[in-house]
Amino acid sequence: MNTHVSDITQLTIDNWGVTAQTGILTDVLLGKPDHFRWVPLNSISAVNQANEEQMGYRFDKQKAMRQHRQMVEAYEANGVRVHYVEADEGLPSSVFTRDSSFMTPWGAVITSIQTPPRRRDYAVASEFYRNAGIPIWKWVTAGHFEGGDFVIVKPRVALMGWSGDRSTKDGAEQVEGWLREKGWDTFVVPIPPQFVHMDAVVVMLEENLALVCEDALPSYAIDWFDKQGIERIVVPYADCVKLGGNVVSLGGKRVLSMSHNVNVNRTLKERGFEVTAIDYEMFALGGGGVHCSCHELRRLVPG
C-alpha cells in the first residue's frame, strides 16, 4: 500500500536516515508523474528528443503513467514503502527525485539544480521533508550540486561527481566539506557531461560491489576504488550512455532495473542477483532511469 504525506507524519525521525546505499531498502521517495513530459534536461534527453521524427519516438502520457505505476508495484512487491513529493504542473521533471535532495545520517540535503526547468524542484522536495518531520540538514548554496552526483560507497566514505553542466566543482566541494567535518572520507572527481551524473557511472550493488563505467572515469579514480576494496562489474560505454548502469539496489542481492538493459541485466543474473526489470522507456528517453527516479529515505544497516 502506498504511504502518503498524512501517513508519514505519524512516523518518528528515528525511522529515517541513510548510512550506506546498500543494505535492505525499506523506504523510497518518488515523484508523481501527473505532469511529466519530455523537456531537454541533458545531453541524453536532448539527443533523443531531437531524433523523435527519425527514430519514431513519441511521448505517450498514458504509457508513462503505466510504466511509473509498474515501478511503484515493483517496489511494493519487494517490501519497500513508497512515498511521494507532490506533483506540480510547473515542475514536469520533479519525477526524477534523485537530484533535488539526498539523505544522510543527519537528515536531508536540499540540492541546487542547474538546469532551468528544474531549478525550483527544491520546493516540492523541501515540502516533503517538512511534512514528514524529517530534518533538513543542509542546503547547497555554493554553485550547483545535484543528488545524482552523491554516492555513499560504504559507511563514512562518499564519492561525489561534477560535470559542470549539472553539478559544479564548488558545489561538490561544499558538500565534501560538510562530510569531512563529520569525519567522513570523501573523493570528488569530474565526469564527462554526456553522463550527466555520477549515478550513470557508479551505482553500489552490495557491500564492496559496484556497477562502474570505467570509460567515464580517470585512471586515478579506478585506483581509488581499488584502495577502497570495491569490486567492479564493468558497464561498457555504449550501455552506460543509455543508462545501462542506472539500477537500484534493493538489498539482499535484489536489483530494480530497466528491460532495455539487456547486457547489464544478464550479467547481474549471472552474478546471482534477482533482477526485476521494468519497461521504463518513456522516462529513459526523457533523460532519467529508475535510479534517477528514486531517492532512498531509509535502508537497514548492512550486516
Regions found by a protein language model. Name each.
Residues M1-G303:
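The feature marks the mature, well-folded catalytic cores of soluble enzymes
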